[in-house]
């Protein structure tokens, strides 16, 4: 695949660093140490069953190829930290992927499964709501049927929802409080 010069954003690596510094500190610039050995890709369990190539994501970030923001690969990472632990250059790959995801989300690019999980958190307070099977499993290991979370204390769910709205999370993900459903996202195209 041949790329045109118009497909490169020379400010993209800097944008990644600046977007992530306030959370990850110096780790936000660690991707600049990557020498493309491929250890991360070899270690990635998601990459064994999906098209995710961690090394390619990092290479694209370094090269300023910001089209990765709209791609599916960015959302295939399970954040297991296997690449993070194996990297010989101590590139904080999982953190870099989280930073790039945040940039993508700001522009309206969020994988649909992630949006649906966010909606579950908004509706129930949980990414994986308690069902009958989970209740049985909890009882079998000596726990109460309902965990001491929003399932047991439904009044806390409104607090969770308020926090999500106060952080503009609902707007970014496209959650409508009135319909309790997802709305289409407004995608911000890069300036060309």
UniProtKB/Swiss-Prot annotation:
[4Fe-4S] cluster 1 binds at residues 34, 37, 40, 87. GO terms for biological process: methanogenesis. InterPro entries: 4Fe4S_Fe-S-bd (IPR017896), 4Fe4S_Fe_S_CS (IPR017900), CoB/CoM_hetero-S_Rdtase_csu (IPR017680), HdrC_iron-sulfur_subunit (IPR051460), Helical_ferredxn (IPR009051). The keyword tRNA processing does not apply. Keywords: 4Fe-4S, Iron, Iron-sulfur, Metal-binding, Methanogenesis, Oxidoreductase. Its EC number is 1.8.98.5, 1.8.98.6. Residues 25-54 form the 4Fe-4S ferredoxin-type domain. It comes from the Archaea. Pathway: Cofactor metabolism; coenzyme M-coenzyme B heterodisulfide reduction; coenzyme B and coenzyme M from coenzyme M-coenzyme B heterodisulfide: step 1/1. The keyword Iron-sulfur applies. Binds 2 [4Fe-4S] cluster. One of its GO terms (cellular component) is plasma membrane. NCBIfam families: CoB_CoM_SS_C. The heterodisulfide reductase is composed of three subunits; HdrA, HdrB and HdrC. B1 and B2 subunits are interchangeable, as are the C1 and C2 subunits. The heterodisulfide reductase forms a supercomplex with formylmethanofuran dehydrogenase (Fwd), F(420)-non-reducing hydrogenase (Vhu) and formate dehydrogenase (Fdh). This is H(2)/formate:CoB-CoM heterodisulfide,ferredoxin reductase subunit C1. It comes from Methanococcus maripaludis (strain DSM 14266 / JCM 13030 / NBRC 101832 / S2 / LL). The lineage of its organism: Archaea, Methanobacteriati, Methanobacteriota, Methanomada group, Methanococci.
């Amino acid at each position: 695949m041949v790329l045109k010069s118009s497909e490169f954003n020379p400010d993209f690596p800097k944008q990644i660093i600046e977007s992530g510094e306030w959370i990850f500190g110096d780790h936000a610039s660690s991707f600049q140490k990557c020498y493309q050995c491929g250890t991360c890709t070899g270690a990635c369990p998601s990459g064994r069953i999906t098209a995710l190539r961690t090394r390619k994501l990092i290479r694209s970030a370094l090269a300023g190829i910001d089209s990765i923001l709209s791609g599916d690969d960015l959302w295939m990472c399970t954040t297991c930290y296997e690449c993070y632990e194996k990297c010989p250059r101590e590139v904080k790959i999982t953190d870099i992927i989280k930073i790039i995801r945040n940039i993508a989300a700001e522009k309206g690019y969020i994988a649909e499964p992630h949006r649906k999980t966010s909606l579950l958190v908004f509706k129930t307070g949980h990414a994986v709501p308690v069902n009958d099977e989970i209740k049985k499993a909890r009882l079998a290991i000596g726990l109460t049927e309902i965990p001491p979370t929003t399932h047991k204390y439904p009044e806390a769910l409104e607090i969770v929802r308020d926090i999500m709205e106060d952080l503009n999370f609902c707007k970014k993900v496209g959650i409508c409080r009135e319909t309790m459903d997802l709305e289409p996202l407004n995608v911000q195209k890069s300036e060309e």
